[in-house]
């Protein structure tokens, strides 16, 4: 199982966006990068064309390396990064990600 998946709430632990939180929109496994909502915004200059009617400067998220992200346990009161252990959900008998400290489910589950 991957440590960080689409829909997970993460905290940035390094770089210019340190301590900010966001939701993972997309993960690129081979490149080890992820796009996080509202983080690492870049400006792209686009020409107007048939598909993209408006041209000009568009702001969008750029990928950030997975080593700069950490999962958050949103049920715990503190916002420290979470170390993950794997267990099975008794209801569905599937693998799930659990917080080591609080034993809560983590991620977008």
Curated annotation (Swiss-Prot):
Keywords, ordered alphabetically: Ribonucleoprotein, Ribosomal protein, RNA-binding, rRNA-binding
Cellular component, GO annotation: ribonucleoprotein complex; ribosome
Domain of life assignment: Bacteria
Keyword Secreted: no
UniProt xrefs under CDD domains: KOW_RPL26 (cd06089)
Region (Disordered): 85-109
The keyword Ribonucleoprotein is assigned to this record: yes
Protein known as: Large ribosomal subunit protein uL24
């Amino acid at each position: 199982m991957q440590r960080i998946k689409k829909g997970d709430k993460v905290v940035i632990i390094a770089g210019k966006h340190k301590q900010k939180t966001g939701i993972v929109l997309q993960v690129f496994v081979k490149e080890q990068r992820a796009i996080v909502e509202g983080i690492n915004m870049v400006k792209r200059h686009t020409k107007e064309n048939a598909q993209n009617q408006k041209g000009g400067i568009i702001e969008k998220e750029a990928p950030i390396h997975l080593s700069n992200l950490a999962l958050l346990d949103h049920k715990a009161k503190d916002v420290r990064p979470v170390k993950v252990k794997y267990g099975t959900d008794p209801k569905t008998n599937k693998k799930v990600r659990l917080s080591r400290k609080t034993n809560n489910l983590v991620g977008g589950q």
